[in-house]
Amino acid sequence: MEKHIKHAIRWPSLDTIPWAWVAIAIGLLILYFPTFWDLFHGLWGTERHAHGPIVFFVSIWFFYFKFKQLPEYGITYDPSPKLGWPILVLGLLLFILGRSQTLLIFEVGSLIPVLLGITLIFMGTRVAKFLWFAFFFLCFVVPLPAFVVDAATLPMKTAVSFATAHILYALDYPIARTGVMLTIGQYQLLVADACAGLNSLFTLEVLGLLYMNVTHHESPFRNFMLAVLIIPISFIANVTRVIVLALITYHWGDAAGQGFLHEFSGIVLFITALMLVIATDSLLRFFSRKFEKVPSTQSVDLKR
């Protein structure tokens, strides 16, 4: 028992961090600083990939959050260099390929095997298994190729514009739709990627998965359903945003619709989505408890 306690991972203070970890941190900074500098001043500055910085900083916080839990769960370290080195080398090769050929999916995606390899080399499989969700979380940071984004966003934009047009028409607003172009009164609105793209879906999916992992839901049914229902929740939130923008433009003009209120509608989107996630989780919690009580009641009857 004493041996187990001695080998338990403890969250180190700044004055006890070994120089090896400082060297690793400096190496990662030298390796990936140019990559993320380019992302912050390039791709992540566009509306299509605006979710990137949010997911990136949430990922950093989540790694910190999980590392702080290691002593609490008594996770022991068992370094596995034979398993970690091949994964680390693979990650470095992916980084070299991505950086040299300007393939962001490899350049940014290489961070996952690099961090996993370092974890296995110095901490082992137990810590790596404990951090599996944190590594999975990093997948949302990797920029997808443009053809994948275009193929995924076109049906979403069409569906959002279709729903918006029918809802506002039912409310007696003079609205017409041509593809993803909405005409309301004398104004035309283009349902762009930012209004119904993968950026909002990815961000909401990340927040939903983070919410599930932090709250430690034990019901597999509840976790699965909440993860799946985030997609229609994102759709409803996007429709709400486009409706708000259309009404602002119709009543206060194009300048209001494309100015500050356009950015404010993005806040409305996430508030709506988070409220729907919480409401959905409450319903799932109610039904999961109801289903869990049924077998226990039957077992009591059988004992009688």
From Swiss-Prot:
A GO CC annotation recorded here is:
plasma membrane
- Protein's membrane topology: Multi-pass membrane protein
Q: Name one GO biological process term.
A: proteolysis
Q: Alphabetically list the UniProt keywords.
A: Cell membrane, Hydrolase, Membrane, Protease, Transmembrane, Transmembrane helix
> Could you tell me one molecular function GO term of this UniProt entry?
peptidase activity
Q: What does UniProt list as catalytic?
A: C195 (acyl-thioester intermediate), R241 (proton donor)
Tell me where on the tree of life, at the top rank, the source sits. Answer: Bacteria
Entry keyword Thylakoid = no
A Pfam family recorded for this sequence: Exosortase_EpsH
Show the InterPro entries listed in the entry. Answer: EpsH-like (IPR013426), Exo/Archaeosortase_dom (IPR026392), Exosortase (IPR019127), Exosortase-2 (IPR017544)
Give the first-level EC class, as a single word.
hydrolase
Q: Which residues cross the membrane?
A: 17-37, 50-70, 78-98, 103-123, 130-150, 189-209, 228-248, 259-279
EC numbers? 3.4.22.-
After gene disruption, what is the outcome? Disruption of the gene does not significantly alter exopolysaccharide (EPS) production.
Annotated localization: Cell membrane
Family label? Belongs to the exosortase/archaeosortase family. Exosortase EpsH subfamily.
Q: What does this protein do?
A: Transpeptidase that recognizes and modifies its substrate by proteolytic cleavage of a sorting signal. Following cleavage, a covalent intermediate is formed via a thioester bond between the exosortase and its substrate, which is then transferred and covalently attached to the cell membrane. This sortase may recognize a tripartite structure consisting of a conserved Pro-Glu-Pro (PEP) motif, followed by a transmembrane alpha helix domain and a cluster of basic residues, usually at the C-terminus of target proteins.
Q: What is this protein called?
A: Probable exosortase EpsH
Protein species of origin:
Methylobacillus sp. (strain 12S)
In the record, what lineage is assigned to the organism producing the protein?
Answer: Bacteria, Pseudomonadati, Pseudomonadota, Betaproteobacteria, Nitrosomonadales
